[in-house]
From Swiss-Prot:
Organism, scientific name: Homo sapiens
Gene name of this polypeptide: GPR141
Stated name of the protein: Probable G-protein coupled receptor 141
Entry-linked SUPFAM superfamilies: Family A G protein-coupled receptor-like
Cytoplasmic side: 44-50, 111-131, 205-227, 289-305
Superkingdom, taxonomy of origin: Eukaryota
Alphabetical list of Gene3D superfamilies matching this protein: Rhodopsin 7-helix transmembrane proteins
Length: 305
């Protein structure tokens, strides 16, 4: 029986491509540069701010995920997993945990800024720094003590897997409750993303109508412009995977035969979610004087026409 499972896993391996190696190298380098860059910026930011705390937590999420990337690269290059099945489950689950935690912090940042806009407040912040630290510590305790052990312990438990092959847990999707949970997550993420996009477009349209000629002199406009970076990451990195996931779930759960091309495309879309590590670079870049000058110049050209 184990031998049968091993051969089946081998035949169901997605197409190996050097593009995945290149992508993860780019993610690793860009992610590290982003983490280092944002650290210099965080020193000057208000640590009681809800937005700042969300950004700090983003740094932590990206940093932990980036620690697992070298293991993925080693596997992709050598085509053999040498670190044991339990650690394979952790590294595999970490890509999903990274995506959803990043999405969660984006929602926190965007909703906070929407509240600031609609309630006409200068900022939303914790009463004391200790409260901000406690909120973050509580969340990470929940993730470390409950979420990670639960995911790793329940991840890939229904079938036997070859310890030399990693990230091949698609057969778990054949189970009804696993499929239902996946569909619920996909629908939730897509719905929240669409709502955030609608709010963002509405806010920017309001600002353009109200402050047409003095738009660029308002700090709130630049804050809302930064929001577009986060919305852009969601649209480019997360939503393609979520939409393809619907098709992938349908193919995997309704077919006994292995479709290596579908598995390959699923792996590509999932890997693209890791590019969200570049959000920290975009955050730093969006606050730079050079970027503001370019936007001002572009806006003046539009008004002149």
């Amino acid at each position: 029986m184990p031998g049968h499972n091993t051969s089946r896993n081998s035949s169901c391996d997605p197409i190996v491509t050097p593009h995945l190696i290149s992508l993860y190298f780019i993610v690793l380098i860009g992610g590290l540069v982003g983490v280092i860059s944002i650290l210099f910026l965080l020193v000057k930011m208000n640590t009681r701010s809800v937005t700042t705390m969300a950004v700090i937590n983003l740094v932590v999420v990206h940093s932990v995920f980036l620690l697992t990337v070298p293991f993925r690269l080693t596997y992709l290059i050598k085509k053999t997993w040498m670190f044991g099945l339990p650690f394979c489950k952790f590294v595999s689950a970490m890509l999903h945990i990274h995506m959803y935690l990043t999405f969660l912090f984006y929602v926190v940042i965007l909703v906070t800024r929407y509240l600031i806009f609609f309630k006409c407040k200068d900022k939303v912040e914790f009463y004391r720094k200790l409260h901000a630290v406690a909120a973050s510590a509580g969340m990470w305790t929940l993730v470390i003590v409950i979420v990670v052990p639960l995911v790793v312990s329940r991840y890939g438990i229904h079938e036997e897997y070859n310890e030399e092959h990693c990230f091949k847990f698609h057969k778990e999707l054949a189970y009804t409750y696993v499929k239902i949970i996946n569909y619920m997550i996909v629908i939730f993420v897509i719905a929240v993303a669409v709502i955030l996009l609608v709010f963002q477009v509405f806010i920017i349209m309001l600002m353009v109508q109200k402050l047409r000629h003095s738009l660029l002199s308002h700090q709130e406009f630049w804050a809302q412009l930064k929001n577009l970076f986060f919305i852009g990451v969601i649209l480019v990195c997360f939503l393609p995977y979520q939409f393809f996931r619907i098709y992938y779930l349908n193919v995997v759960t309704h077919s006994n035969a292995c479709n290596s091309k579908v598995a390959f495309y699923n792996e590509i879309f999932l890997s693209v979610t890791a590019i969200s590590c570049y959000d920290l670079l975009l955050f730093v870049f969006g606050g730079s004087h050079w970027f503001k000058q370019k936007i001002i110049g572009l806006w003046n050209c539009v008004l002149c026409r």
